[in-house]
Regions:
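Thiamine diphosphate
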Residues: 1-166, 170, 175, 306, ...
Length: 324
């Protein structure tokens, strides 16, 4: 069925709520409004306001309440309205949610999913366009994932909700309206922690996640017209990282370019580069390169396109690798 990224998430939430009465949604404007991106549209009407709960604008309280519900046997799903709004909840997520497994020796579970629209592409400035994923990927006790397609949005939200671990679920907001085919009745083709090889290639490996996967695939098409084949990998899981899939590719291509919207400095690309350098040093034909946002907040709408990684910047990095 052809559907949008947002509609695929909606169906995933609906199916999870149908399957388990303990699945409860919490967030700002998710009920009557259906969320600012309409991901939860009609769910309150169909399941009631005791399972789709409109909350005050207080992210720390939202996550704290959901955490308490998770400890009592529910499977809450929180929507943080915009990426920059997650910071008031940072203490709850990092100091409480992430630590409960270790604090109790694994005896207490916290099946909590925190959905966060992230990244640019919609012309919104600071607080509404940010890439905070690395803060959570750095935190032991959290799974951090990001789908890039409607099909993965559906399957990954179902998998995340079913886990007994807390999951931070980053949704690339500029992909909410992307359309592709989704099999709502099939089983997931990959575990939640596995990366996906989107295109096979021999000259260089390009790793991306979230909103930059489509950009990397566009770059691969342009490279093919110029006689170069790129292997594009959708990371999907930001923590844990599927190093095996990346390493297998790099051992074949000898070159690696990592793409993300977040600033390059101390970004997730730095961790991937370090791990691949440690593991594949003698296979590398060129330094590992990174393409990311600049070391500034997301700029105003008219400047945003210059801030986000684009095919030209990716291809320039690939050319540097091939010339080494």
């Amino acid at each position: 069925m052809i559907t949008t990224f947002a509609a695929a998430l909606n169906t995933g939430l609906r199916r999870a709520m149908e399957d388990d009465a303990k699945v409860v949604l919490l967030g700002e404007d998710i009920g009557r409004l259906g969320g600012v991106f309409r991901v939860t549209d009609t769910l309150q009407k169909d399941f009631g306001d005791n399972r789709v709960i409109d909350t005050p604008l207080a992210e720390s309280g939202i996550v704290g309440t959901a955490f308490g519900m998770a400890l009592r046997g529910y499977r809450p799903v929180v929507e943080i309205q915009f990426d920059g709004f997650v910071y008031p909840a940072f203490d709850q997520i990092v100091s409480q949610v992430a630590k409960i497994h270790y604090r109790t020796g694994g005896k207490v579970k916290a099946p909590l999913t925190i959905r966060i629209p992230f990244g640019g592409g919609i012309g919104a400035v600071e607080h509404h366009s940010e890439s905070p994923e690395v803060y959570f990927a750095h935190t032991a006790g959290l799974r951090v994932v990001s789908p890039s397609t409607p099909a993965d949005a559906y399957s990954m939200i179902r998998q995340a909700i079913a886990l007994d671990d807390p999951v931070v679920f980053f949704e690339p907001k500029r992909r909410y309206w992307d359309k592709s085919d989704v099999d709502f009745d099939g089983e997931p083709d990959l575990p939640l922690h596995r990366a996906r090889v989107c295109t096979r290639g021999a000259d260089a490996t390009v790793v991306a996640y979230g909103g930059t996967v489509a950009t990397a695939l566009t770059a691969a098409k342009i490279a093919a017209e110029e006689g170069h084949s790129l292997e594009v990998i959708d990371l999907r899981s930001l923590s844990p990282i599927d190093v095996d899939t990346i390493a297998e590719s790099v051992e074949k291509t000898g070159r690696l370019v990592i793409v993300h919207e977040a600033p390059v400095f101390a970004g997730l690309g730095a961790e991937i580069a370090a791990r691949i350098t440690e593991r594949c040093f003698y296979h590398l034909e060129a330094p590992v390169l990174r393409v990311g946002g600049y070391d500034i907040p997301y700029p105003p709408a008219k400047l945003e396109k210059h801030h986000l990684p684009d095919p030209d910047r990716i291809l320039a990095a690939v050319d540097r690798c091939l010339a080494a």
